[in-house]
């Protein structure tokens, strides 16, 4: 019997290598971390994206790099870079719902174009020695579009397919479509993971009981909001303080623009992080204009746990 896997979802701007290392070191509770997508711009793989998945920056962290592409040539360019780095498990993004991506036929926008998906699958399948996983939605503008896509994924023999049961046009609004998810789960010939609206650990147990065929789950925004979500024994203020200290140290080491740049990155985290922290502390974080003021406000927020 295959083990049930819990994976950390990629969130652009949040789950950087700094966040992943801190989470893995202090909180844990997940089996692996899928990275924010890597993409090609002006004919080259973005250096910033490659730096984020560099093995030296992810030492000891079980990482699965994710690529975003609609053209075989772009996909193969990224594959070559990742293979050169030593990666042998790579994830394909067929799920990004954001219009600037999807309206260009990438991410979930590709789900409305099965002929392009077929060409991409053929190109990826030609690469030897790589295991693939896929992150996808039910479709772009129709919740039955997955039916034309699922048979095409067989070319990759994916080790898992993570399904967010909305269509791309919904982005993160509206209800998840569990009836369509159930149908996909029944016909899939490979392991299926569920992703979407998981905010409590107990929900994972419920999903496992309801769907015996389910092979795993992927948890996203709720894990950024509550990093100890899947390791409640580490939900103390001391653990959160250590976690936050690692983020501060990481950004100070990485960024060259001084405290102002570090402050900008740390404040952005609080758009999701610890939403139940006292309003006064959260307001002080938002208004802070120096790293010293920020650190005092952040400590007040964490001390209230």
Label each PLM-derived region with a short phrase:
Residues 1-305:
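Flavin-dependent oxidoreductase catalytic cores
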